[in-house]
From Swiss-Prot:
Disulfide cysteine pairs (residue numbers): none
GO molecular function annotations of the record: structural constituent of ribosome
This protein's GO CC annotations: cytosolic small ribosomal subunit
Family to which the UniProt record says this protein belongs: Belongs to the universal ribosomal protein uS2 family.
Organism name: Aeromonas salmonicida (strain A449)
Matching Pfam families: Ribosomal_S2 (PF00318)
Cited Gene3D superfamilies: Glucose-6-phosphate isomerase like protein, domain 1, Helix hairpin bin
CDD domains assigned: RPS2 (cd01425)
Protein's name in the database: Small ribosomal subunit protein uS2
PROSITE patterns on file: RIBOSOMAL_S2_1, RIBOSOMAL_S2_2
Length: 242
């Protein structure tokens, strides 16, 4: 699994929390102190908790489990898409539509519509339509792609959520809780850690910090998958023992 050192975290600003007046008292045990009215997160706590979270993601990925990356605010959006794409997993980075998990049946129908429209755009169907109708379908396809593009090939509910901001994505966390899907989340000093199975106390706003978490998670998935392929090959007798 990907290792992230305390030095890496310091350089990325993981230890900078929110202004003290916005704090959530439930995060008290993870706060080292305050500097210039900004809470400082105790990285002595964050590092082992981050390792625990990565271990869990590794165990899910090794069993071919599905990881859903969730980060819909501007600071996280691109990084979430990149990380999920790099490790061939899934993401929501635009807007969390209520019921995305708890109402999967309906979401599945929307995904089917998106795929139908994609096929139509490629097989010449759009060209046979009036300009207005083709434009309307293109707009519908773009809108669906924005919302569902990152989960259109998920093929069912995920096995774990990796959330960038517990406060901003509280609806996603609640849905996962209702369905018994484990949640790994970055939790800043202004957020509520309740409902998060693997809390990672850390800055959820700085782009460098967000990229650090996401890159480590993507690397962890890739390593676990590669390890699984080696094990499978050995079991199948493709790799000779030295």
């Amino acid at each position: 699994m990907a290792k992230v050192s305390m030095r890496d975290m310091l350089q990325a600003g993981v230890h900078f929390g929110h202004q003290t007046r916005y704090w959530n008292p439930k995060m008290k045990s993870y706060i080292f102190g305050a500097r210039s009215k900004v809470h400082i997160i105790n990285l002595e706590k964050t590092v082992p908790m981050f390792d625990d979270a990565m271990n869990f993601i590794s165990s899910v990925a090794a069993k071919k489990g599905k990881v859903l990356f969730v980060g819909t605010k501007r600071a996280a959006s691109e990084a979430v898409k990149d990380a999920a794409g790099r490790c061939d997993q899934f993401y929501v980075n635009h807007r969390w539509l209520g019921g995305m998990l708890t109402n999967w049946k309906t979401v599945r129908q929307s995904i089917k519509r998106l795929k139908d429209l994609e096929t139509q755009s490629q097989d010449g169907t759009f060209e046979k339509l009036t300009k207005k109708e083709a434009l309307m379908r293109t707009r519908e396809m773009d809108k669906l792609e924005k919302s569902l593009g990152g989960i259109k090939n998920m093929g069912g509910l995920p096995d774990v959520l990796f959330v960038v901001d517990a406060d901003h994505e509280h609806i996603a966390i609640k849905e996962a809780n209702n369905l018994g899907i484990p949640v790994v989340s970055i939790v800043d000093t202004n957020s509520n850690p309740d409902g998060v199975d693997y809390v990672i106390p850390g800055n959820d706003d700085a782009i460098r910090a967000v990229q650090l978490y996401l890159n480590a998670a993507a690397d962890t998935v890739l390593e676990a998958r590669a390890q699984d392929i080696v094990v499978q090959a050995e079991q199948d007798g493709f790799v000779e023992a030295e």
